[in-house]
């Protein structure tokens, strides 16, 4: 990475920190900028700036989240000192989708911090940030489609399954494995974009067309073959079968288990790709700040699921599916040469995460904030009702 680029990243990080910090902490932002400017070694200055960013950003984000999530009534209620985190958790349960957007954005930024430290090409950072913009734009557009009441869920689910099958049959191949399509010179992995969305949606909206879509997706994973995505199917559907078994889940689980078994027959010999695979380990070898950025970003991916599980009794199946999907993606990246979702280079998982947020409730019951949870009691939190958007 050139000296000029390092200094630009330092300036960008300082500007982002100053824009995020609340007024009482603004002096810390200026102090970090001045200290970084006084460090002659550009690499050390960049590491100092990113370390300071990781140290101060949680407090800044906590302050902003409290403002974003707090209800108009809650803003006028006195809050006891030292309860900021608890208020954020309580308020976030009212807007699970917004919480997911915050987690996704934070994870992408942590991933770009890792790539900057690792010396990745500037284009890689731009690809991930561009994918974030595309994903959030699609999320906004599909939310509007949901409000318009278009009932095209079943047809679009079948179209997504068809896209996965088409990738297996006609996609770009490497060592006999067909998982990718090229768009604008960039390799995209449709399974990372579509499969998480299909699985989280299936947890809410189960019928024959949805089951056929999942079975077709399982066939596609066996044909590609893609062991990581087949494992995602098995892990998610097993969790749903334990939570709320029915004939649709059992049928889809049987097909997914057969798909995963088929992927085990053939060895997956694809080598690790820099900035994409195995970065959970290599980042710590590079620098502790880089490793913590990767680890923190991955942990953020399951935060909506953890909070939803604890606070939303009636929506638990949705949050279990969401958490199982992204836990499976993280597990695959940790165990083999598979893409590290969101924090590694590649836009497919970023777009896929954004789309999977559509299956989470946009708003939850305000009663969840009225009182703190009591021992043995579970807050009531209704779901949004039947899903009316195919990608949701």
Role assignments for model-derived ranges:
Residues 3, 84-104, 152-153:
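N-terminal membrane topogenic signal
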Residues 103, 113-213, 218-224, 327, ...:
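Membrane-helix boundary/helix-loop-helix interface segments in multi-pass membrane proteins
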Residues 216-240, 264-271, 284, 288, ...:
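Helix-loop-helix junctions and helix-breaking kinks within/between transmembrane helices
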Residues 1-86:
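Negatively charged linear elements and acidic catalytic determinants
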Residues 248-273:
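A membrane-periplasm/extracellular boundary helix in multi-pass inner-membrane enzymes
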Residues 158-171, 190-225, 232-243, 252-258, ...:
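Alpha-helical transmembrane segments of multi-pass inner-membrane proteins
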């Amino acid at each position: 990475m050139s000296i000029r680029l390092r200094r630009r990243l330092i300036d960008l990080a300082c500007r982002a920190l100053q824009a995020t910090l609340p007024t009482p902490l603004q002096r810390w932002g200026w102090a970090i900028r001045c200290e970084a400017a006084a460090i002659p070694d550009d690499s050390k200055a960049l590491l100092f700036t990113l370390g300071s960013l990781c140290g101060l950003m949680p407090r800044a984000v906590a302050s902003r989240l409290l403002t974003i999530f707090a209800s108009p009534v809650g803003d006028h209620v006195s809050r006891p000192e030292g309860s900021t985190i608890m208020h954020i958790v309580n308020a976030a349960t009212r807007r699970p989708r917004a919480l997911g957007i915050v987690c996704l954005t934070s994870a992408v930024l942590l991933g770009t911090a890792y790539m900057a430290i690792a010396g990745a090409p500037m284009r890689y950072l731009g690809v991930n940030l561009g994918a974030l913009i595309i994903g959030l734009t699609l999320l906004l557009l599909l939310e509007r489609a949901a409000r318009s009441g278009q009932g095209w869920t079943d047809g679009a689910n079948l179209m997504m399954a068809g896209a996965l099958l088409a990738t297996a049959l006609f996609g770009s191949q490497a060592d006999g494995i067909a998982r990718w399509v090229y768009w604008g010179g960039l390799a995209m992995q449709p399974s990372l974009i579509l499969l998480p969305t299909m699985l989280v949606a299936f947890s809410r909206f189960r019928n024959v067309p949805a089951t056929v879509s999942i079975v077709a997706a399982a066939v596609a994973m066996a044909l590609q073959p893609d062991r990581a995505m087949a494992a995602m199917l098995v892990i998610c559907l097993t969790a749903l079968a334990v939570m709320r078994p029915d004939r649709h889940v059992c049928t889809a689980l049987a097909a997914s288990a057969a798909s995963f078994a088929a992927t085990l027959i053939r060895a997956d010999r694809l080598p690790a790709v820099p900035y994409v695979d195995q970065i959970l380990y290599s980042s710590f070898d590079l620098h502790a700040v880089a490793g913590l950025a990767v680890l923190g970003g991955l942990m953020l991916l399951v935060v909506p699921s953890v909070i939803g599980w604890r606070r939303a009794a009636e929506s638990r199946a949705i949050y279990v599916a969401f958490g199982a999907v992204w836990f499976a993606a993280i597990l695959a990246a940790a165990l083999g040469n598979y893409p590290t979702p969101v924090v590694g280079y590649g836009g497919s998982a970023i777009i896929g995460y954004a789309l999977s947020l559509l299956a989470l409730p946009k708003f939850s019951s305000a009663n969840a904030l009225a009182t703190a949870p009591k021992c043995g009691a579970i807050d009531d939190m209704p779901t949004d009702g039947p899903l009316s958007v195919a990608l949701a």
